[in-house]
Amino acid sequence: MSRVCQVTGKKPMVGNNRSHAKNATRRRFLPNLQNHRFWLEGEKRFVKLRISTKGMRIIDKKGIEVVVAELRARGEKV
């Protein structure tokens, strides 16, 4: 399973660790992904999404029905 948020599309980024002496070593910044089940009232079933915490806030704001409709319009299987 890839580390990509299904709602926002957030992916891992790359950057540097910086020591006290300012030495740079490459590292990855991973999105805060959660596996979460949401109840779709219109379909009387749960959907499982792998979403970031930012994606959860978007679902809280817009509603799960709207977000799932947007995912399906993008061609994502939900």
Curated annotation (Swiss-Prot):
Annotated segments matching region Disordered: 1-21
One GO term (biological process): translation
Molecular function GO terms recorded: structural constituent of ribosome
Assigned keywords, A-Z: Ribonucleoprotein, Ribosomal protein
One Gene Ontology cellular component: cytosolic large ribosomal subunit
HAMAP family, A to Z: Ribosomal_bL28
Classification via NCBIfam families: L28
Family membership: Belongs to the bacterial ribosomal protein bL28 family.
Name of the molecule in the record: Large ribosomal subunit protein bL28
Organism (species): Shewanella woodyi (strain ATCC 51908 / MS32)
Gene name tied to this protein: rpmB
